[in-house]
Swiss-Prot record:
PANTHER family: 30S RIBOSOMAL PROTEIN S18, SMALL RIBOSOMAL SUBUNIT PROTEIN BS18M
Its job: Binds as a heterodimer with protein bS6 to the central domain of the 16S rRNA, where it helps stabilize the platform of the 30S subunit.
Gene3D superfamilies per record: Ribosomal protein S18
InterPro entries: Ribosomal_bS18, Ribosomal_bS18_CS, Ribosomal_bS18_sf
Stored Pfam families: Ribosomal_S18 (PF01084)
GO cellular component terms, semicolon-separated: cytosolic small ribosomal subunit
Organism of this sequence: Chlamydia felis (strain Fe/C-56) (Chlamydophila felis)
One GO biological process term: translation
Gene Ontology molecular function terms on file: small ribosomal subunit rRNA binding; structural constituent of ribosome
Chain ranges passing through the membrane: none
Gene transcribed to yield this protein: rpsR
Subunit structure: Part of the 30S ribosomal subunit. Forms a tight heterodimer with protein bS6.
Homology family: Belongs to the bacterial ribosomal protein bS18 family.
Protein name as annotated: Small ribosomal subunit protein bS18
Keyword field: Ribonucleoprotein, Ribosomal protein, RNA-binding, rRNA-binding
Length: 82
């Protein structure tokens, strides 16, 4: 007898994303480190969500604050560069 195909058999396997800041042993994120901050924003200048970057909840808040500070000071653009 044939087994019915269930929807969960077609789903992709999930993998655990490790927070890059926790695994590197960071305590804070410096708003002057623009090269690191640019990895967490899109081409249009939006902050990437946790589900894409794998950043922990604690560091997502710190990262968001650092990006906003860098924008206000002028280290990062508010909108993406063409």
């Amino acid at each position: 007898m044939n087994k019915p195909v269930h929807n969960n058999e077609h789903r992709r396997k999930r993998f655990n994303k490790k927070c890059p800041f926790v695994s590197a042993g960071w305590k804070t994120i410096d708003y002057k480190d623009t090269e690191t901050l640019k990895k967490f924003i899109t081409e249009r200048g939006k902050i990437l969500p946790r589900r894409i970057t794998g950043v922990s909840s604690r560091f997502q808040g710190i990262l968001t604050l650092a990006i906003k500070r860098a924008r206000h000071i002028g280290f990062l653009p508010f909108v993406g560069e063409d």
